[in-house]
Amino acid sequence: MAAKDVKFGDSARKKMLVGVNVLADAVKATLGPKGRNVVLAKSFGAPTITKDGVSVAKEIELKDAFENMGAQLVKEVASKANDAAGDGTTTATVLAQAIVNEGLKAVAAGMNPMDLKRGIDKATAAIVAELKNLSKPCADSKAIAQVGTISANSDNSIGEIIAEAMEKVGKEGVITVEEGSGLENELSVVEGMQFDRGYLSPYFVNKPDTMVAELEGPLLLLVDKKISNIRELLPVLEAVAKAGRPLLIVAEDVEGEALATLVVNNMRGIVKVAAVKAPGFGDRRKAMLQDIATLTGGQVISEEIGLSLETATLEHLGNAKRVILSKENTTIIDGAGADGDIEARVKQIRAQIEETSSDYDREKLQERLAKLAGGVAVIKVGAGTEVEMKEKKARVEDALHATRAAVEEGVVPGGGVALVRALAAIADLKGDNEEQNVGIALLRRAVEAPLRQITANAGDEPSVVADKVKQGSGNFGYNAATGEYGDMIEMGILDPAKVTRSALQAAASIGGLMITTEAMVADLPEDKPAAGMPDMGGMGGMGGMM
């Protein structure tokens, strides 16, 4: 085991503070409408330019082990805020820096760190409750666009495209962000349920100009196993041919003679048919087949529930207005499922989302929910260069998280004003002793930090602006983009309440823990001996000289 270096008391805290300040100073340069960019070198490819706090924080590693511990703890603040609300990482970092700096001054003056932390926790709980009171629901498209614009660093086009996407697919709908090929941002919306499986044979194509298979008013046969024997399929095929309607088969796979027979029947026009693999794998495939069954009013033919292909009848098949199959995707439009069944299925998926602890599972469940409840919107980000594309895509993703958070918990006045207004909740708050009161006072000063930093980044005097904002009331604040004072809500400067709340909670949690640090342990750097001189090698080829 490697030897360790241990530091105690003030010498440990001073080192930690250096790391905190290095990381926070790099991150806080990006805050506000006039925040600057940070350039990150990559081990391969072009450098990345970003204004996203958590991206900057993730890149920072310091050489000194004790300083690096401080930096890593603040990085954790940014990550926690990002995980909770998807935005507000820079605000969280600025708050954490202010709490740690103020707190360590109090500890150096002889205050008890544990009581300081208790005071900070009390004040944080009161401010969080006040933020909930201050928040107003984010109901209309205009408010959603404003939140998106502010989060995307005052880029109106991003705010507007997100509001448009939410209007089209609903607030529950899935909105994905992709890299576009043009200069402008584009929005495309997929109506109905789409999954990423295409036709099993190009011979199913009936629109050769676009290479798609389109079935009007089809029946859907949903099977949770492989189909390779055509005999199993014959009863259903005959019934469908008599009904004179097209058929879409969704199964684990269709292969061999079964696929060949379907292709031949389709080409001869005996029965209009297409086949596609079921989406997903394992249990997720079963769940998605059940989703399609609910959407189309059919039943999954599964031996688990005592149904087999030979006994399947037209009653077991689903119905839809139209199905479009391309090489990569299948879209089911206007399924004939009962609204009550679809709602029950949506409720069930929502309950699973609440219970799951895995981010991956949650994302997949939300995709399933959107396919049932709304649709899927794709925002294609346009830019002039690859570097700008990456920077812009990160901003769009941030703005999307912010708007979702706003829809969830409402909005508060932006620009750091909400935190200043929430101070009213701790104006008369008292701790159990004098040192807890110092912790409460410390947080009172720290929550002004985001407002002061936004002002400093805009090139104005933080103390003057903070003073004037504190003298005002309600939504009165400072618009750093224009240098004007006024009603923040009317000026369209909104923050999601969830983002502000998560930023403060993450900062207070980790800031409080750092104040109570008394010892730090790190690996000692290994002293590697200098490499010796390489040998000269043999003097080959010089034989015969003697």
Curated annotation (Swiss-Prot):
Pfam family, one: Cpn60_TCP1
GO molecular function list: ATP binding; ATP-dependent protein folding chaperone; isomerase activity; unfolded protein binding
Protein's UniProt keywords contain Protein biosynthesis: no
Catalytic activity, EC: 5.6.1.7
Binding site for ATP: 30-33, 51, 87-91, 415, 479-481, 495
SUPFAM superfamilies noted in UniProt: GroEL apical domain-like, GroEL equatorial domain-like, GroEL-intermediate domain like
Main location: cytoplasm
Catalytic activity: ATP + H2O + a folded polypeptide = ADP + phosphate + an unfolded polypeptide
Highest taxon above the source species: Bacteria
Role summary: Together with its co-chaperonin GroES, plays an essential role in assisting protein folding. The GroEL-GroES system forms a nano-cage that allows encapsulation of the non-native substrate proteins and provides a physical environment optimized to promote and accelerate protein folding.
Subunit organization: Forms a cylinder of 14 subunits composed of two heptameric rings stacked back-to-back. Interacts with the co-chaperonin GroES.
Protein name per its UniProtKB record: Chaperonin GroEL
Gene for this chain: groEL
